[in-house]
UniProtKB/Swiss-Prot annotation:
[4Fe-4S] cluster binds at residues 408, 411, 415. It is an enzyme of class 4 (lyase). Its cofactor is [4Fe-4S] cluster. GO terms for molecular function: 4 iron, 4 sulfur cluster binding; carbon-carbon lyase activity; zinc ion binding. Zn(2+) binds at residues 268, 332. Its EC number is 4.1.99.17. Keywords: 4Fe-4S, Iron, Iron-sulfur, Lyase, Metal-binding, S-adenosyl-L-methionine, Thiamine biosynthesis, Zinc. It catalyses: 5-amino-1-(5-phospho-beta-D-ribosyl)imidazole + S-adenosyl-L-methionine = 4-amino-2-methyl-5-(phosphooxymethyl)pyrimidine + CO + 5'-deoxyadenosine + formate + L-methionine + 3 H(+). Signal peptide: none annotated. It holds the Pfam family ThiC_Rad_SAM. This is Phosphomethylpyrimidine synthase. Substrate binds at residues 66, 94, 123, 162, 184-186, 225-228, 264, 291.
Length: 428
């Protein structure tokens, strides 16, 4: 029985109790929202992750970290270093490897990860076809489905499944005047398969079987946005919205069948459209968890897209987005190295918290209030240990040596908080 089915029967499981304690939400609210598909627990019952990661309505915003090899850079040691960084900063992890022994890499990443691991199975199908048959679109439907099942057996907790993309939508998008017709790698692979084979999306024609597979492992289907905007000029055009409408139908079918599901979102979105992007998705899908890539609010930010996108991510989180997929300084330019992965992860941890202050209020802001209290008292050790990155904060605090006065080296003896405390003493 899946977690959704248990919740519908009114069962408060140990996992629901753990979610309640972690997120400070009543067990009954958690149960009800799981039953409705508004909260999910990323997991694979055959291989549980070490970290409990509930995502959805009324819960803190989570962040996802993408790692993985490319056809140009295959360095397993570097990817495993990224796993360590992900364990420290992230909530979920996706292995997007496209180079090397994909099965071996995935299994090693899952073994080293404390987090639920996700994948995009069409990558492996396309790459295997390319290597064996000299063309990426030559894989059969059975080969794609067998890869999905193999990855579930390995312990994958969630997968991007581009089932909302129809053949007709793909053809129209490719013929359109979009700045960039398709930027989703997995989406483009599915589009290419449909055009080459003259068939409908294999995820759509095998949807019922996919539901059975995911239900067996109680894993999550992450409905990919193949036609997400890859330029702010393309945001919320007929193709993005058309796919979202198709996706919304699949969402309802998955939940009705007791399968956990979330929806992936853009992408590149102008600042003024970010909040209503979230609200539109929630309205169409009945409030299932929303997993957004950024979004980037400008197109010219590289190599600072982790900053440009964290602006959109904070707004999305505040508006109700549930899972933020990070970007790194290497986005649009290169495979990220380990340092860039950490920089992206920290930017998104900040964005998620900024959004949660709006979305969840005082219970989240308590952390900020504690830091501000210690800052006002110039209790540096206590303040620093509460910060988002205490180790780096201490390095910055002491970069010119230990301050000679109680204040930091910015204001020194002219620190307003130090003087305010003196004035308070005089006032009595």
């Amino acid at each position: 029985m899946s977690i959704i089915e248990e919740a519908r029967r009114g069962i408060i499981t140990d996992e629901i109790k753990s979610i309640s304690k972690l997120e400070k939400v009543s067990p009954e609210k958690v149960r009800k929202r799981i039953a409705e598909g508004k909260i999910m627990l990323l997991r694979n019952v055959k291989r549980p992750s070490k970290k409990l990661v509930p995502i959805g309505k009324g819960l803190t915003t989570k962040i996802n970290i993408n790692i993985g090899t490319s056809s140009e850079v295959i360095d397993l040691d570097m990817e495993l270093e990224k796993v360590k960084i992900s364990n420290k900063w992230g909530d979920t992890l996706m292995d997007l490897s496209t180079g090397g022994d994909i099965d071996e890499i995935r299994r090693k990443i899952i073994d080293k990860s404390d987090l639920p691991v996700g994948t995009v199975p069409v990558y492996q199908a396309f790459i295997q076809s390319f290597k064996k048959k000299s063309g990426g679109a030559y894989f059969s439907e059975d080969e794609l489905l067998s890869i999905v099942e193999r990855q579930l057996k390995d312990g994958v907790a969630f997968m991007t499944i581009h089932a909302g993309l129809t053949r007709e939508l793909a053809i129209r998008a490719l013929k359109s005047d979009r700045v960039i017709p398709i930027v989703s790698r997995g989406g483009d692979m599915i589009a290419g398969w449909m055009i080459h084979n003259g068939k409908e999306n294999p995820y759509r024609t095998n949807w019922k079987y996919l539901l059975e597979l995911f239900k067996e492992y109680d894993a999550t289907i992450s409905l990919g946005d193949a036609l997400r905007p890859g330029a702010t000029a393309d945001a919320h055009d007929e193709f993005q919205i058309g796919e979202l409408i198709e996706t919304a139908r699949l969402v309802k079918d998955a939940i009705n069948n007791g399968v956990q599901v979330m929806v992936e979102g853009p992408g590149h979105v102008p600042l003024n459209e970010v909040a209503w992007d979230v609200k539109l998705m929630k309205k169409l899908t009945g409030g299932v968890p929303y997993y957004v890539l950024g979004p980037l609010v400008i197109d010219v930010g590289a190599p600072y897209d982790h900053i440009a996108s964290s602006i959109g991510a904070a707004i999305a989180s505040a508006a109700g987005a549930d899972l933020l997929c990070y970007l790194t300084p290497a986005e649009h330019l290169s495979l990220p190295n380990a340092k860039q992965v950490e920089e992206g992860a920290i930017a998104y941890r900040i964005a998620a918290h900024a959004g949660d202050i709006v979305k969840l209020g005082k219970k989240v802001r308590k952390w900020d209030d504690e830091v501000s209290y210690y800052r006002g008292k110039l209790e540096w050790d206590k303040m620093i240990e509460k910060l988002i990155d205490p180790e780096q904060a201490y390095k910055v605090y002491t970069q010119f040596g230990e301050p000679n006065v109680k204040a930091c080296t910015m204001c020194g003896g002219y620190c307003p908080m130090m003087w305010a405390m003196e004035q308070v003493k005089k006032i009595g």
